[in-house]
């Protein structure tokens, strides 16, 4: 059934949008959010009939009153034979026409540039600037004016300007509204989230279930990014989400709880309830998600299952064998004891929940992870929560969109379609989406682009300009002097999940004296654009597992922008916290002494991998620190194990020369890798 916007109907009826909204709510009990909301044609026709009926009755009454007045006061012949004023008639006619034919334009933000409003009004920049000057506003083409000023300006050109603040989610829900009656629903697999404290064995437990070694691929044995995996048990599929356990990734855990059906809370039998365990319990309760407690490491000396159950009661979780309704399963990821019992409990709980979805509708779900791949472009891991997603479908994801070019399952196999509760990796998006964004399948790419563009315009950042640069070393002094009221940070990381976690952790550091604000977060190497943004917004750049490119380094030195890079997320948080408290006392400074590009790779059985490299900048020195950078992301960090010039050992090799080198404990060197050589210089401590 066709629909009509409130403001369009108001224009037809020649009344204000506000009057129409009131009429809809009082006379028809139709609730609408604002002038941009859509109503059914049937309701619109009823309103037209009602108003036309009122107009007729009012008109009849007016005529009766006029006749009565005429009878009481007969018209006297005018002694003044003055002709009617044609100018007045003309003006009255023009005003009436303008009221009826006034053009309407919409904007989606609080501000708009002079250029944008000129284009919308279809007037030259000179005309618009002239009108602004007459209104006492001096503005150039690229300067912004607020909504109130834009409204007054539009009125000068017989145009009404409206603020479009509708939620696109409503539009999408309208687009996606399919039949969800019982006959269309089918049983779907449960989505399981594994939560718990650091090192309590979450990933090891998943390894035991999947019979694979994920932990060995993660730096330091700690899961850094969310992964989604599907396992088969007795012919039934179970989807697992592995959320990192350490405190800085609270946001990731919260995101996992929003899409999950059942949470497995892993608690070490020898450790008991820890801070992150408490947070996980809170997330589950807030999301109203069923909980199964896996008491892990029961093979360890000092394991005490009863102690864990006792601690759980303090948080309202009473084990079934203690008379409660919380399922507790003792397991050992190491010996695989209790794994089968745990899986049986998952399937039993999912049967009770009666999980269903409609595979024959348009797909929708959530982004689990997203990153930028040099060869494949934006790559996103999606969890389909309803409907079926196919290769070739158009989707809108947050403020980005795309048409699916390829789709892979959790095992890396190319697939053509995927149904509810299935995690997939897709290619074809225009940009890297935010982890946790909702995705929706739409009819065509044009619709997806339109919705994404609206969202981009809506969330466009307005950056504050400042002249004084901030660095971590002098941040405390500037806070004390009152120079800094807001600390702007640009966060770059290797994957979107890390960006999100860093943003949330850093913004929590805000105090009464200074507010910490992440003005931008993105995936990939630190580039010149990031430095430009930091310059304009008086910010500091933080990199997690990424490095600045050459242009960024040159620009940062020129503009005095502070760039800090980290491999451990807590170091970044502690540095900002210490700087704000005036406790930042740097003892060593990393100095990059040179970079080299790997041109050829040789594998020698007795030695390992030798790289033939060309020195691009500075020099390489033996025994100096070295990191391998691939596509702007730090792959490995160690030191140079050997450095040769031809067949001779060399202490150092200068810029413009070629050399052979090997990296300590690292053999996965590839052509095109950048070897960054650095030393740690001791510097004087600063008193802040």
Swiss-Prot record:
Residues 54-95 are annotated as: Disordered. Residues 296-299 are annotated as: G4. Keywords: Cytoplasm, GTP-binding, Initiation factor, Nucleotide-binding, Protein biosynthesis. Residues 332-334 are annotated as: G5. Pfam families: EF-G_D2 (PF22042), GTP_EFTU (PF00009), IF-2 (PF11987), IF2_N (PF04760). GO terms for cellular component: cytosol. Its main location: cytoplasm. GO terms for molecular function: GTP binding; GTPase activity; translation initiation factor activity. Residues 196-203 are annotated as: G1. Residues 242-245 are annotated as: G3. Residues 221-225 are annotated as: G2. GTP binds at residues 196-203, 242-246, 296-299. Residues 86-95 have a biased composition (Basic and acidic residues). Gene3D superfamilies: 1.10.10.2480, P-loop containing nucleotide triphosphate hydrolases, Translation factors, Translation initiation factor IF- 2, domain 3. It is found in: Cytoplasm. Residues 187-354 form the tr-type G domain. Belongs to the TRAFAC class translation factor GTPase superfamily. Classic translation factor GTPase family. IF-2 subfamily. HAMAP family: IF_2_B. One of the essential components for the initiation of protein synthesis. Protects formylmethionyl-tRNA from spontaneous hydrolysis and promotes its binding to the 30S ribosomal subunits. Also involved in the hydrolysis of GTP during the formation of the 70S ribosomal complex. This is Translation initiation factor IF-2.
């Amino acid at each position: 059934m066709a629909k009509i916007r409130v403001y369009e109907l108001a224009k037809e009826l020649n009344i204000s949008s506000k009057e129409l909204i009131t009429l809809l709510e009082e006379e028809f009990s139709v609730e609408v959010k604002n002038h941009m909301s859509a109503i059914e044609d049937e309701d619109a026709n009823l309103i037209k009939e009602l108003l036309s009926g009122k107009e007729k009755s009012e008109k009849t009454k007016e005529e009766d009153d006029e006749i009565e007045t005429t009878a009481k006061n007969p018209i006297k012949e005018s002694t003044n034979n003055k002709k009617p004023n044609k100018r007045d008639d003309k003006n009255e006619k023009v005003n009436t026409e303008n009221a009826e034919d006034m053009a309407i334009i919409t904007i989606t933000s609080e501000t708009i540039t002079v250029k944008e409003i000129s284009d919308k009004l279809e007037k030259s920049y000179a005309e618009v600037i002239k009108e602004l000057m007459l209104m006492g506003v001096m503005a150039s083409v690229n300067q912004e004016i607020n909504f109130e000023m834009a409204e007054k300006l539009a009125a000068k050109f017989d145009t009404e300007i409206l603020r479009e603040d509708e939620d696109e989610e409503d539009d999408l829900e309208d687009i996606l509204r399919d039949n969800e009656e019982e006959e269309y629903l089918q049983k779907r697999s449960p989505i399981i989230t594994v939560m718990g404290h650091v090192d309590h064995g979450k990933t090891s437990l998943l390894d035991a279930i999947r019979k694979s070694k994920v932990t060995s691929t993660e730096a330091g044995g700690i899961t850094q990014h969310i992964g989604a995996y599907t396992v088969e048990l007795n012919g039934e599929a179970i989807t697992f989400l592995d959320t990192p356990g350490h405190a800085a990734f609270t946001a990731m855990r919260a995101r996992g709880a929003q899409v999950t059906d059942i949470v497995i809370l892993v608690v070490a039998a020898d450790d008991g309830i820890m801070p992150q365990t408490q947070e996980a319990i809170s997330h589950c309760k807030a999301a109203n998600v069923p909980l199964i407690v896996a008491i892990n490491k029961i093979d360890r000396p000092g394991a005490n299952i009863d102690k864990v159950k006792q601690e759980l009661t303090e948080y309202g979780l009473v084990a079934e064998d203690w008379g409660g309704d919380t399922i507790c399963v003792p397991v050992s990821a190491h010996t695989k004891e209790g794994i089968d019992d745990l899986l049986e409990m998952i399937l039993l709980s999912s049967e009770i929940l009666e999980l269903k979805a409609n595979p024959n509708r348009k797909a929708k779900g959530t982004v689990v992870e997203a990153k930028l791949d040099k060869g494949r472009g934006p790559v996103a891991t999606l969890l389909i929560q309803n409907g079926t997603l196919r290769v070739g479908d158009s989707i809108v994801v947050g403020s980005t969109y795309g048409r699916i070019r390829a789709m892979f399952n959790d095992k890396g196999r190319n697939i053509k379609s995927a149904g509810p509760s299935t995690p997939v990796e897709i290619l074809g998006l225009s940009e890297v989406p935010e982890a946790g964004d909702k995705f929706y399948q739409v009819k065509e790419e044009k619709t997806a682009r339109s919705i994404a563009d609206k969202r981009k315009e809506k969330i466009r950042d307005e950056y504050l300009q400042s002249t004084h640069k901030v660095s971590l070393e002098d941040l405390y002094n500037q806070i004390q002097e009152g120079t800094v009221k807001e600390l702007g940070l640009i966060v770059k990381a290797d994957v979107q999940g890390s960006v999100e976690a860093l943003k949330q952790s850093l913004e929590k550091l805000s105090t009464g004296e200074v507010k910490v604000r992440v003005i931008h977060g993105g995936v990939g190497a630190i580039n010149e654009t990031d430095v430009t943004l930091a310059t304009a917004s008086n910010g500091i750049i933080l990199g997690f597992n990424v490095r600045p490119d050459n242009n960024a380094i040159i620009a940062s030195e020129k503009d005095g922008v502070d760039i800090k890079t980290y491999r451990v997320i807590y170091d970044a948080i502690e540095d900002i916290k210490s700087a704000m408290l005036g406790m930042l006392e740097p003892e060593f400074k990393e100095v990059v002494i040179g970079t080299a590009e790997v041109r050829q790779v040789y594998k020698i059985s007795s030695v390992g991998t030798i790289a033939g490299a060309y020195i691009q900048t500075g020099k390489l020195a033996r025994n100096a620190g070295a990191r391998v950078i691939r596509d702007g992301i730090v792959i490995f960090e160690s030191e140079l194990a050997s450095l040769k010039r031809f067949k001779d050992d060399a202490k150092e090799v200068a810029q413009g020369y070629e050399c052979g080198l090997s990296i300590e404990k690292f053999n996965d060197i590839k052509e095109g890798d950048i070897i960054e050589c650095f030393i740690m210089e001791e510097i004087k401590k600063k008193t802040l």
